Amino acid sequence: MDGNSTHPAPNLKTTMAWSRISNQLGHWNDRKVIAIPLSDFLNTHPDIQSGIIAEFKKATGEEGMFARDPESLGIMLLGPVKLFKPDSVVVDGNLFWDPKGIHASAPKEQQKKAKIPRPPNAYILYRKDHHREIREQNPGLHNNEISVIVGNMWRDEQPHIREKYFNMSNEIKTRLLLENPDYRYNPRRSQDIRRRVSPYLKIKLLNYDVNGNLLWGTVNAEDAALIRTHFHGVVRVEEMDDGCRIVCRPVAGSRKLRAAVVDTWMPRYTVDTTPVTEDDDAQAFNFNDPLGGAYFPLNEHLWITVNQNPPFNAPPPNPNPHLDFVHPDGMEAVVHNVQNMIAQVQEANEAAALTLPPPPPLRLLSLRLWLMIPLTQLSFPL
Protein backbone atom coordinates (compact mmCIF):
# COMPACT_ATOMS: atom_id res chain seq x y z
CA MET A 1 0.00 0.00 0.00
CA ASP A 2 1.26 3.45 -0.82
CA GLY A 3 2.92 5.31 2.07
CA ASN A 4 1.02 8.52 1.36
CA SER A 5 -2.33 6.76 1.83
CA THR A 6 -1.11 5.03 5.02
CA HIS A 7 0.24 8.22 6.67
CA PRO A 8 -1.76 11.35 5.79
CA ALA A 9 0.11 14.54 5.06
CA PRO A 10 0.88 16.73 8.10
CA ASN A 11 -1.33 19.54 6.85
CA LEU A 12 -4.31 17.17 6.68
CA LYS A 13 -3.65 15.95 10.22
CA THR A 14 -3.40 19.54 11.35
CA THR A 15 -6.73 20.36 9.72
CA MET A 16 -8.38 17.37 11.37
CA ALA A 17 -6.96 18.25 14.80
CA TRP A 18 -7.96 21.90 14.43
CA SER A 19 -11.52 21.01 13.40
CA ARG A 20 -12.00 19.08 16.65
CA ILE A 21 -11.14 22.06 18.87
CA SER A 22 -12.04 25.14 16.80
CA ASN A 23 -15.72 24.95 17.76
CA GLN A 24 -14.76 26.39 21.15
CA LEU A 25 -14.12 29.79 19.54
CA GLY A 26 -17.74 30.93 19.73
CA HIS A 27 -19.08 34.40 20.45
CA TRP A 28 -19.34 33.46 24.13
CA ASN A 29 -15.57 32.90 24.35
CA ASP A 30 -14.30 36.48 24.59
CA ARG A 31 -10.91 35.35 25.93
CA LYS A 32 -10.31 33.15 22.85
CA VAL A 33 -8.99 30.29 24.98
CA ILE A 34 -9.31 26.66 23.88
CA ALA A 35 -9.12 23.72 26.30
CA ILE A 36 -7.36 20.57 25.04
CA PRO A 37 -7.12 17.27 26.96
CA LEU A 38 -3.54 16.78 28.13
CA SER A 39 -3.43 13.20 26.81
CA ASP A 40 -4.35 14.39 23.30
CA PHE A 41 -1.75 17.14 23.46
CA LEU A 42 1.05 14.77 24.51
CA ASN A 43 0.16 12.36 21.69
CA THR A 44 0.25 15.15 19.09
CA HIS A 45 3.36 15.56 16.91
CA PRO A 46 5.23 18.88 17.40
CA ASP A 47 4.69 19.71 13.73
CA ILE A 48 0.93 19.35 14.19
CA GLN A 49 1.14 21.57 17.30
CA SER A 50 2.88 24.22 15.19
CA GLY A 51 0.14 23.86 12.58
CA ILE A 52 -2.54 24.33 15.24
CA ILE A 53 -0.81 27.54 16.33
CA ALA A 54 -0.89 28.76 12.73
CA GLU A 55 -4.59 27.90 12.38
CA PHE A 56 -5.31 29.72 15.64
CA LYS A 57 -3.64 32.87 14.26
CA LYS A 58 -5.71 32.64 11.08
CA ALA A 59 -8.94 32.33 13.07
CA THR A 60 -8.27 34.99 15.71
CA GLY A 61 -5.62 37.24 14.17
CA GLU A 62 -3.43 36.92 17.28
CA GLU A 63 -0.26 34.99 18.10
CA GLY A 64 -1.10 31.85 20.05
CA MET A 65 0.67 29.55 22.48
CA PHE A 66 0.03 26.49 24.63
CA ALA A 67 -0.10 26.83 28.41
CA ARG A 68 -0.56 24.42 31.31
CA ASP A 69 -3.71 25.00 33.36
CA PRO A 70 -2.76 24.74 37.07
CA GLU A 71 -6.43 24.52 38.13
CA SER A 72 -6.94 21.35 36.10
CA LEU A 73 -3.80 19.30 35.53
CA GLY A 74 -5.46 17.24 32.82
CA ILE A 75 -6.10 20.27 30.57
CA MET A 76 -3.82 22.18 28.20
CA LEU A 77 -4.82 25.70 27.15
CA LEU A 78 -4.40 27.33 23.76
CA GLY A 79 -4.81 31.10 23.74
CA PRO A 80 -3.28 34.47 22.82
CA VAL A 81 0.29 35.11 23.96
CA LYS A 82 -0.69 38.39 25.63
CA LEU A 83 -3.19 36.55 27.82
CA PHE A 84 -0.52 34.57 29.65
CA LYS A 85 2.13 35.96 31.98
CA PRO A 86 5.43 36.67 30.22
CA ASP A 87 7.67 35.82 33.20
CA SER A 88 6.98 32.09 32.93
CA VAL A 89 9.17 29.38 31.52
CA VAL A 90 8.65 29.08 27.77
CA VAL A 91 10.05 26.16 25.78
CA ASP A 92 9.86 24.75 22.27
CA GLY A 93 9.86 28.12 20.55
CA ASN A 94 6.98 29.72 22.50
CA LEU A 95 4.72 26.74 21.88
CA PHE A 96 4.51 25.45 25.44
CA TRP A 97 4.17 27.27 28.75
CA ASP A 98 4.34 25.54 32.13
CA PRO A 99 3.90 28.10 34.92
CA LYS A 100 3.87 25.39 37.66
CA GLY A 101 1.10 26.93 39.66
CA ILE A 102 0.72 30.27 37.84
CA HIS A 103 -2.46 30.44 35.79
CA ALA A 104 -3.57 32.69 32.98
CA SER A 105 -4.78 36.20 33.78
CA ALA A 106 -6.69 38.79 31.83
CA PRO A 107 -4.65 41.37 29.88
CA LYS A 108 -3.93 44.60 31.71
CA GLU A 109 -6.11 46.66 29.40
CA GLN A 110 -9.05 44.34 30.15
CA GLN A 111 -8.57 44.30 33.92
CA LYS A 112 -11.10 46.44 35.72
CA LYS A 113 -9.55 49.38 37.51
CA ALA A 114 -9.94 49.46 41.26
CA LYS A 115 -12.67 51.87 42.26
CA ILE A 116 -11.36 54.90 44.10
CA PRO A 117 -13.46 55.59 47.22
CA ARG A 118 -15.12 58.95 47.44
CA PRO A 119 -13.36 61.30 49.90
CA PRO A 120 -15.37 61.68 53.13
CA ASN A 121 -17.00 64.98 53.97
CA ALA A 122 -16.73 66.80 57.29
CA TYR A 123 -19.74 65.11 58.88
CA ILE A 124 -18.50 61.61 57.97
CA LEU A 125 -15.19 62.33 59.69
CA TYR A 126 -17.02 63.72 62.72
CA ARG A 127 -19.29 60.68 62.89
CA LYS A 128 -16.30 58.32 62.63
CA ASP A 129 -14.67 59.97 65.66
CA HIS A 130 -17.82 59.87 67.82
CA HIS A 131 -19.55 56.65 66.72
CA ARG A 132 -17.54 54.35 69.01
CA GLU A 133 -18.01 56.67 71.99
CA ILE A 134 -21.80 56.75 71.56
CA ARG A 135 -21.95 52.96 71.13
CA GLU A 136 -19.95 52.37 74.31
CA GLN A 137 -22.24 54.69 76.25
CA ASN A 138 -25.40 53.10 74.78
CA PRO A 139 -24.64 49.46 73.89
CA GLY A 140 -28.22 48.68 72.92
CA LEU A 141 -28.71 51.41 70.31
CA HIS A 142 -29.12 50.65 66.62
CA ASN A 143 -26.82 52.31 64.08
CA ASN A 144 -29.70 54.43 62.80
CA GLU A 145 -30.36 55.78 66.29
CA ILE A 146 -26.66 56.49 66.77
CA SER A 147 -26.66 58.44 63.50
CA VAL A 148 -29.51 60.60 64.79
CA ILE A 149 -27.61 61.36 68.00
CA VAL A 150 -24.39 62.20 66.16
CA GLY A 151 -26.33 64.34 63.69
CA ASN A 152 -27.79 66.40 66.54
CA MET A 153 -24.32 66.74 68.06
CA TRP A 154 -22.92 67.94 64.72
CA ARG A 155 -25.73 70.46 64.37
CA ASP A 156 -25.06 71.94 67.82
CA GLU A 157 -21.26 71.71 67.60
CA GLN A 158 -19.01 74.74 68.16
CA PRO A 159 -17.98 76.60 64.96
CA HIS A 160 -14.25 76.02 65.50
CA ILE A 161 -14.82 72.26 65.86
CA ARG A 162 -16.84 72.16 62.64
CA GLU A 163 -14.15 74.19 60.87
CA LYS A 164 -11.55 71.65 62.01
CA TYR A 165 -13.40 68.80 60.30
CA PHE A 166 -14.04 70.86 57.17
CA ASN A 167 -10.28 71.45 56.89
CA MET A 168 -9.59 67.74 57.37
CA SER A 169 -12.06 66.90 54.60
CA ASN A 170 -10.45 69.41 52.21
CA GLU A 171 -6.98 68.01 52.92
CA ILE A 172 -8.09 64.46 52.18
CA LYS A 173 -9.79 65.55 48.96
CA THR A 174 -6.71 67.52 47.83
CA ARG A 175 -4.41 64.56 48.52
CA LEU A 176 -6.70 62.21 46.60
CA LEU A 177 -6.76 64.51 43.55
CA LEU A 178 -2.97 64.77 43.59
CA GLU A 179 -2.59 60.99 43.67
CA ASN A 180 -5.41 60.41 41.13
CA PRO A 181 -5.62 63.37 38.71
CA ASP A 182 -8.28 61.61 36.61
CA TYR A 183 -10.61 60.99 39.54
CA ARG A 184 -14.25 61.93 38.92
CA TYR A 185 -17.14 61.20 41.22
CA ASN A 186 -19.75 59.23 39.29
CA PRO A 187 -22.87 58.67 41.40
CA ARG A 188 -25.04 55.68 40.65
CA ARG A 189 -28.05 56.18 38.45
CA SER A 190 -31.42 56.09 40.12
CA GLN A 191 -32.43 52.91 38.27
CA ASP A 192 -29.26 51.16 39.50
CA ILE A 193 -29.96 51.85 43.16
CA ARG A 194 -31.69 49.00 44.92
CA ARG A 195 -34.94 50.24 46.37
CA ARG A 196 -35.47 49.45 50.03
CA VAL A 197 -38.91 48.08 50.72
CA SER A 198 -40.67 49.37 53.79
CA PRO A 199 -40.74 46.88 56.69
CA TYR A 200 -44.49 47.52 57.00
CA LEU A 201 -44.95 46.18 53.47
CA LYS A 202 -42.86 43.10 54.30
CA ILE A 203 -45.04 42.50 57.37
CA LYS A 204 -48.12 42.67 55.12
CA LEU A 205 -46.87 39.74 53.04
CA LEU A 206 -46.91 37.34 56.01
CA ASN A 207 -49.75 35.08 57.12
CA TYR A 208 -52.71 36.34 59.15
CA ASP A 209 -55.76 34.78 60.74
CA VAL A 210 -59.37 35.68 59.90
CA ASN A 211 -59.24 38.63 62.32
CA GLY A 212 -56.15 40.12 60.70
CA ASN A 213 -53.69 39.05 63.43
CA LEU A 214 -50.21 37.90 62.44
CA LEU A 215 -49.68 34.15 62.74
CA TRP A 216 -46.25 33.50 61.22
CA GLY A 217 -44.23 34.04 58.08
CA THR A 218 -40.94 33.04 56.44
CA VAL A 219 -38.58 35.64 54.96
CA ASN A 220 -34.90 35.79 54.04
CA ALA A 221 -32.19 36.94 56.44
CA GLU A 222 -32.06 40.50 55.09
CA ASP A 223 -35.82 41.04 55.45
CA ALA A 224 -35.76 39.42 58.88
CA ALA A 225 -33.13 41.90 60.06
CA LEU A 226 -35.24 44.78 58.75
CA ILE A 227 -38.40 43.51 60.45
CA ARG A 228 -36.53 42.80 63.71
CA THR A 229 -35.22 46.39 63.76
CA HIS A 230 -38.57 48.12 63.22
CA PHE A 231 -40.68 45.68 65.28
CA HIS A 232 -38.24 45.06 68.12
CA GLY A 233 -39.92 43.08 70.90
CA VAL A 234 -43.10 42.54 68.90
CA VAL A 235 -41.94 39.63 66.75
CA ARG A 236 -39.61 36.71 67.35
CA VAL A 237 -37.17 35.68 64.60
CA GLU A 238 -36.30 31.98 64.32
CA GLU A 239 -33.50 31.04 61.93
CA MET A 240 -34.14 27.99 59.73
CA ASP A 241 -32.38 26.29 56.82
CA ASP A 242 -34.59 27.88 54.17
CA GLY A 243 -34.86 31.34 55.71
CA CYS A 244 -36.07 33.05 58.88
CA ARG A 245 -39.43 32.39 60.50
CA ILE A 246 -41.23 35.48 61.85
CA VAL A 247 -43.50 34.62 64.78
CA CYS A 248 -45.63 37.24 66.54
CA ARG A 249 -45.30 37.45 70.31
CA PRO A 250 -48.59 36.78 72.18
CA VAL A 251 -51.35 39.27 73.00
CA ALA A 252 -49.89 42.77 72.75
CA GLY A 253 -47.65 42.05 69.79
CA SER A 254 -50.45 40.68 67.65
CA ARG A 255 -52.66 43.72 68.28
CA LYS A 256 -49.90 46.17 67.51
CA LEU A 257 -48.88 44.39 64.32
CA ARG A 258 -52.46 44.52 63.13
CA ALA A 259 -52.45 48.25 63.81
CA ALA A 260 -49.21 48.55 61.87
CA VAL A 261 -50.51 46.91 58.72
CA VAL A 262 -53.69 49.02 58.72
CA ASP A 263 -52.23 52.40 59.68
CA THR A 264 -48.86 52.36 57.92
CA TRP A 265 -48.15 56.02 58.63
CA MET A 266 -47.93 55.31 62.37
CA PRO A 267 -44.41 55.29 63.98
CA ARG A 268 -42.31 52.35 65.11
CA TYR A 269 -44.05 49.92 67.50
CA THR A 270 -42.80 48.43 70.75
CA VAL A 271 -44.25 45.92 73.20
CA ASP A 272 -47.24 47.10 75.23
CA THR A 273 -46.48 46.15 78.84
CA THR A 274 -49.90 47.09 80.21
CA PRO A 275 -52.03 44.13 81.41
CA VAL A 276 -54.67 42.89 79.03
CA THR A 277 -58.27 43.61 80.02
CA GLU A 278 -61.62 42.54 78.63
CA ASP A 279 -61.99 45.93 76.97
CA ASP A 280 -58.72 45.41 75.12
CA ASP A 281 -59.86 42.02 73.84
CA ALA A 282 -63.09 43.55 72.60
CA GLN A 283 -61.32 46.26 70.64
CA ALA A 284 -60.19 45.57 67.10
CA PHE A 285 -57.00 47.64 67.40
CA ASN A 286 -54.82 48.84 70.26
CA PHE A 287 -54.86 52.56 69.42
CA ASN A 288 -57.35 55.43 69.61
CA ASP A 289 -59.79 55.09 66.75
CA PRO A 290 -61.37 58.48 65.88
CA LEU A 291 -64.28 56.65 64.25
CA GLY A 292 -64.83 54.08 66.97
CA GLY A 293 -68.43 52.87 67.07
CA ALA A 294 -69.44 54.63 63.84
CA TYR A 295 -71.33 52.92 61.05
CA PHE A 296 -69.19 52.46 57.90
CA PRO A 297 -70.89 52.02 54.53
CA LEU A 298 -69.10 49.89 51.95
CA ASN A 299 -66.73 52.46 50.48
CA GLU A 300 -63.37 51.64 48.90
CA HIS A 301 -61.96 55.02 49.96
CA LEU A 302 -62.37 54.30 53.67
CA TRP A 303 -59.75 52.60 55.76
CA ILE A 304 -62.00 49.85 57.12
CA THR A 305 -65.19 48.11 56.07
CA VAL A 306 -67.29 46.11 58.51
CA ASN A 307 -69.30 42.90 58.17
CA GLN A 308 -66.73 41.48 55.78
CA ASN A 309 -64.76 38.44 56.96
CA PRO A 310 -61.58 37.98 54.86
CA PRO A 311 -60.58 34.43 53.89
CA PHE A 312 -58.00 32.53 55.90
CA ASN A 313 -54.37 33.69 55.42
CA ALA A 314 -55.56 36.81 53.57
CA PRO A 315 -53.63 40.01 54.33
CA PRO A 316 -55.44 42.86 56.11
CA PRO A 317 -57.28 45.47 54.03
CA ASN A 318 -55.14 47.99 52.20
CA PRO A 319 -54.85 51.44 53.79
CA ASN A 320 -55.95 54.65 52.13
CA PRO A 321 -53.70 55.01 49.07
CA HIS A 322 -53.48 58.76 49.68
CA LEU A 323 -51.73 58.18 53.01
CA ASP A 324 -48.86 56.02 51.72
CA PHE A 325 -46.33 54.77 54.28
CA VAL A 326 -45.45 58.31 55.44
CA HIS A 327 -47.96 60.92 54.37
CA PRO A 328 -46.12 63.62 52.39
CA ASP A 329 -48.33 66.41 53.77
CA GLY A 330 -47.89 65.49 57.43
CA MET A 331 -50.47 65.03 60.16
CA GLU A 332 -52.75 67.80 58.89
CA ALA A 333 -53.51 65.77 55.78
CA VAL A 334 -54.32 62.73 57.92
CA VAL A 335 -56.74 64.75 60.07
CA HIS A 336 -58.30 66.18 56.91
CA ASN A 337 -58.86 62.64 55.57
CA VAL A 338 -60.47 61.60 58.86
CA GLN A 339 -62.81 64.60 58.73
CA ASN A 340 -63.77 63.74 55.16
CA MET A 341 -64.54 60.18 56.19
CA ILE A 342 -66.73 61.34 59.07
CA ALA A 343 -68.61 63.62 56.66
CA GLN A 344 -69.10 60.68 54.26
CA VAL A 345 -70.49 58.56 57.10
CA GLN A 346 -72.91 61.30 58.14
CA GLU A 347 -74.08 61.82 54.56
CA ALA A 348 -74.62 58.09 54.15
CA ASN A 349 -76.68 57.92 57.36
CA GLU A 350 -78.76 60.94 56.31
CA ALA A 351 -79.40 59.40 52.90
CA ALA A 352 -80.46 56.15 54.56
CA ALA A 353 -82.84 58.06 56.85
CA LEU A 354 -84.54 59.72 53.85
CA THR A 355 -85.28 56.36 52.26
CA LEU A 356 -87.14 55.02 55.33
CA PRO A 357 -91.01 55.08 55.13
CA PRO A 358 -92.68 57.85 57.19
CA PRO A 359 -94.12 56.82 60.57
CA PRO A 360 -97.95 56.37 60.82
CA PRO A 361 -99.89 59.56 61.85
CA LEU A 362 -101.04 59.94 65.43
CA ARG A 363 -104.76 59.16 65.75
CA LEU A 364 -106.94 60.29 68.64
CA LEU A 365 -108.83 57.68 70.56
CA SER A 366 -112.53 57.58 69.84
CA LEU A 367 -115.12 58.41 72.48
CA ARG A 368 -116.09 54.75 72.71
CA LEU A 369 -112.52 53.81 73.68
CA TRP A 370 -112.41 56.60 76.23
CA LEU A 371 -115.57 55.29 77.89
CA MET A 372 -114.10 51.77 78.07
CA ILE A 373 -111.09 52.96 80.11
CA PRO A 374 -111.79 52.95 83.89
CA LEU A 375 -111.40 56.28 85.60
CA THR A 376 -108.92 54.76 88.07
CA GLN A 377 -106.41 54.20 85.22
CA LEU A 378 -106.60 57.81 84.03
CA SER A 379 -104.38 60.46 85.52
CA PHE A 380 -104.63 64.17 84.83
CA PRO A 381 -102.15 66.84 85.75
CA LEU A 382 -103.28 69.12 88.54
Swiss-Prot record:
Residues 116-184 bind DNA. Changing R258S: In a-1m33; abolishes vegetative incompatibility. Signal peptide: none annotated. The keyword Membrane does not apply. One of its GO terms (molecular function) is DNA-binding transcription activator activity, RNA polymerase II-specific. InterPro entries: HMG_box_dom, HMG_box_dom_sf, SRY-related_HMG-box_TF-like. Gene3D superfamilies: High mobility group box domain. GO terms for cellular component: nucleus. Disulfide bonds: none annotated. Its main location: nucleus. It comes from the Eukaryota. It is found in: Nucleus. Keywords: DNA-binding, Nucleus, Transcription, Transcription regulation. The keyword Transcription applies. GO terms for biological process: cell differentiation. Mating type proteins are sequence specific DNA-binding proteins that act as master switches in yeast differentiation by controlling gene expression in a cell type-specific fashion. Transcriptional activator that induces the transcription of a-specific genes like mating factor mfa-1. Required for mating as an a-cell, blocking of heterokaryon formation (vegetative incompatibility) and for perithecium induction. Binds in vitro to DNA containing a specific core sequence 5'-CTTTG-3'. This is Mating-type protein a-1.
